[in-house]
Swiss-Prot record:
Gene3D superfamilies in UniProt: Vibrio cholerae toxin co-regulated pilus biosynthesis protein F, C-terminal domain
Keyword Transferase on entry: no
Entry's transmembrane regions: none
Alphabetic keyword roster: Cell outer membrane, Membrane, Signal
Function: Involved in TCP pilus biogenesis. May be a channel protein.
Protein name: Toxin coregulated pilus biosynthesis protein F
Recorded topology in the membrane: Peripheral membrane protein
Length: 338
């Protein structure tokens, strides 16, 4: 549907599930770049802020999945700190004041070029000004308190810059006057990250802490044989993360070096997808899964890889049977599940 340069739109707030982002809006995209990981953002594969940064700016832990859908608020200093300095004297040319001035002046092309196309100097552009549908979804998020503290306030009412098919338009939310200043509270992710995905759906320092490993004769993590792990999950925790059909799951066994902050093995040197054996003797409120690698039939690939480097650890990732769903990670284990 075509609409005017200034679109008077009073968005009706309906249920969260009734809206979805378009096909180019990646719900699995990872988030943000950390300045300490991406000093030279052009050469780094660690291009985005991890979930910990979302928590720092007021994102509720209950809605961290929305952290993969919205970039840092443009009012935050960390948004501008991600840009490298471009002046010989080290002065920052991309600032909140400059951003606001271009936005209020209607200089959208330069705003796009300097702050969005260039964001973190990605060779595959991943960020964009939201579309009208995305603004509508963000308004729904905000009214349900599912964004950061800053964005929950920003999206309640206002006039928002949108872009669709190369065309800029203004969307009015909440019946605000036409002379209300235009806002662009956040840019959004429109596709997956180039190269490796360095940050995924895991909460730093809180990577599914309710997994119990039955050690001893039931579980085994030693050289020269298959890894066997009997894992106990809390059913309420699984349900909280969208796992209602506890039989429709799969596991990946990952080997590599865990990330220093999150403990997640983002770039495994070995991975193996396995279907678990599900014993029937579950305790009330608990779910047991028996996960094992296929070493005896594939030349001990897991064992040979795991114990080829003293820095390597093994981590077990739970997803839904088709690989979708929130990614639930175990601790990364060394020998004997230590």
């Amino acid at each position: 549907m075509r609409y005017k340069k200034t679109l008077m739109l009073s968005i009706m707030i309906t249920s969260f599930n009734s809206f979805a982002f378009n096909d180019n809006y990646s719900s699995t995209s990872t988030v943000y770049a950390t300045s300490n990981e991406a000093t030279d953002s052009r050469g780094s594969e660690h291009l985005r802020y991890p979930y910990l940064e979302c928590i720092k700016i007021g994102m509720s832990r209950d809605y961290l999945e929305n952290c993969v859908k919205v970039s840092f608020p443009t009012s935050q200093d960390m948004f501008y700190d991600a840009y490298p300095s471009t002046e010989s004297d080290g002065a920052k040319t991309r600032t909140k004041e400059d951003f606001s001035a271009r936005l209020l002046a209607g200089d959208y092309d330069s705003l796009q070029k300097l702050y969005i196309d260039f964001y973190l100097a990605q060779t595959t552009f991943d960020w964009e000004i939201p579309t009208r549908d995305q603004i509508e979804t963000l308004v729904n998020y905000a009214n349900e308190g599912k964004l950061s503290t800053a964005l929950n306030q920003e999206y309640i009412t206002g006039r928002f810059l949108t872009k669709e098919n190369g065309r800029y338009d203004i969307v009015n939310v909440g019946g605000v006057p036409d002379n209300t200043p235009v806002k662009l509270p956040a840019i959004v992710s429109k596709r997956g990250l180039m190269g490796t995905t360095s940050v995924v759906n895991a909460i730093p320092n809180e990577i599914y802490p309710h997994i119990k490993v039955y050690e001893g004769t039931l579980s085994r993590l030693k050289p020269g044989g298959a890894m066997i792990a009997v894992l106990e999950y809390d059913v309420n925790e699984l349900s909280k993360h969208g796992y209602t059909n506890l039989w429709d799951v799969q596991f990946k066994v990952l080997v590599g070096v865990p990330h220093a902050e999150t403990g997640v093995i983002y770039d495994p040197v070995y991975e193996e997808t396995v279907k678990p054996y599900q014993p029937s003797n579950n305790l009330t409120g608990k779910k047991l899964y028996n996960v094992s690698t296929n070493d005896m039939h594939n030349g001990y690939k897991w064992s040979n890889t795991m114990f080829s480097n003293s820095n390597y650890k093994t981590q077990i990732l739970l997803t839904k049977g088709d690989g979708s769903g929130v990614k639930l990670y175990s601790k990364a284990y060394s020998e004997n599940f230590k």
